[in-house]
Every structure is written in C-alpha cells, then in structure tokens.
Amino acid sequence: WFKGMKYRTKRVQLRQKFGVFLIVISTIGLTATSAISAIAEGDRQLNELKQQLEQPAVTAPTAEGGLWVTGDSVILGIRFELDARENIGLINARVGRQATELLEVIKNDKANMAGSTIILNLGNNNRLTQEQVAAIFAEIQDQPRIIVVNTAVPRGWRDENNALIAQYAAQYGARLIDWAAISEGHPEYFGPDGVHLVPAGVRAYVDAITAELPTTSEVTSGQ
C-alpha cells in the first residue's frame, strides 16, 4: 500500500498520509486513555480500602449469638460483605494485629461467645512461632466450629506460617481455608499492596468462609 503511493498525486499522497497519521494518533490516544482509566480505577479501589481500614471494628456481643469473627485488617476489610450474608455476633479486628495481640483479644472476648462458631485469620503481619499458634488454638478449642484462614501475604514467612496453621488446624479439627491456594493466580483480588482485598477478593474470601459454616441440619444436630 505504501509502495503504491508514489504513483498517486501529491494531494492524494498527502491525504492518505494524514489519514494514517490520524489512525496512529487515535490508537495512541486510546491506549493512553485505557492506561489512565486503569490508574484511576486502582486509585478508587485504594481509597475504598483506606476508608474501610481507618477504624478498627469492635462490636458488642449480640444477645442472639452469631458468628465470632476476629483478626487483622483483612478481616476488617471483609466485615460488611460477611455481615450482609450472615449473622455476626461479635467482630474484633484491627490493622496490623499480630499473633500475641490476637491471643489476648481472644481471651477477653471468649466469655461472651461460648457456643459460637469462630472465624479468624492468621499469619499476615508477623512470622508466627509454634508457641503462638499452639496457644491460640488451645484457647479456642471448645468452640463448636473453628474456621481459620491462612495467609497469601507476599512475604518470606508466608509458607512457614501456613505450615504451622495447617498443623494446628488438623490437630484441633479446625476448618482450614487455604486462602493462599484460592487466591493463587488471581491478582484481581488484591489492592496494590498484594495483601488487602478489593471487592472481587472480598467476595471470594467470604465465599470461602460461608462454604465452611455449619448448615441448618448441622446446627440442629450440634455438629
């Protein structure tokens, strides 16, 4: 096509070259617009995450029971979606919470939540020790159902932490949600830090939790 242009008039050549120029500029413009839109969407999701995580979530236990939910900022970020689907009796979550603090929080809240399913996450904010994980599971062993979520945090301690969590989940008969495996290959679940969840990740996380909750028949039979 370009080789044939030399046999056309100067006016035709100019017009055709200008047309090619417009196509190139339009393509560049569309690419730039898409990039800007992607950045804007990322900024919007990041702002939503920041708003959700500004305040810790600590609620008073409800008289009618419900789920006992505790953990760090990932739990904090999924609380509204979980609350929209299930009855939460108590939630106690905070940004940056580590295992030592989690153990103390569990001890303080335990008296009010006897008979409730407990949902907790572990391993995002520090390298766990065997003593810490053992103490946490020992403290909650009498709950009728324990649901523990492991970590997908992009840190060097992730696999080591998850091995400890799996060991004690098996020992105490807990339901283990392998968030590391579930989220593998799904960057769209995470915000820019690779830890906190955007809406798609929140839904997947809560889906995994609700799949492990006791059914009505199990509750009736005391399982």
Where are these regions (language model features)?
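Catalytic His-Asp segment of secreted/periplasmic serine-dependent ester chemistry enzymes
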Residues: R158-Q223
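A generic structural signal for well-ordered alpha-helical segments
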Residues: L82-D83, I140, Y168-A169
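Catalytic phosphate/metal-binding cores of nucleic-acid and nucleotide-processing enzymes, i.e., regions
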Residues: F2, Q55-A60, L103-I106, A111-L120, ...
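A short helix->loop->beta-strand "cap" motif at the edges of active sites that frequently abuts
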Residues: D142-R145, A174
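Catalytic-core regions built around general acid/base machinery
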Residues: A134-Q143
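Conserved beta-strand termini and adjacent loop/short-helix elements that scaffold enzyme active sites
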Residues: N92-R94, V149, I177-I182
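Conserved SGNH/GDSL esterase-like catalytic core that processes O-acyl groups on lipids
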Residues: A60-A135, V153-A163
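N-terminal secretory targeting modules
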Residues: W1-W68, F80, A111-A114, T210-Q223
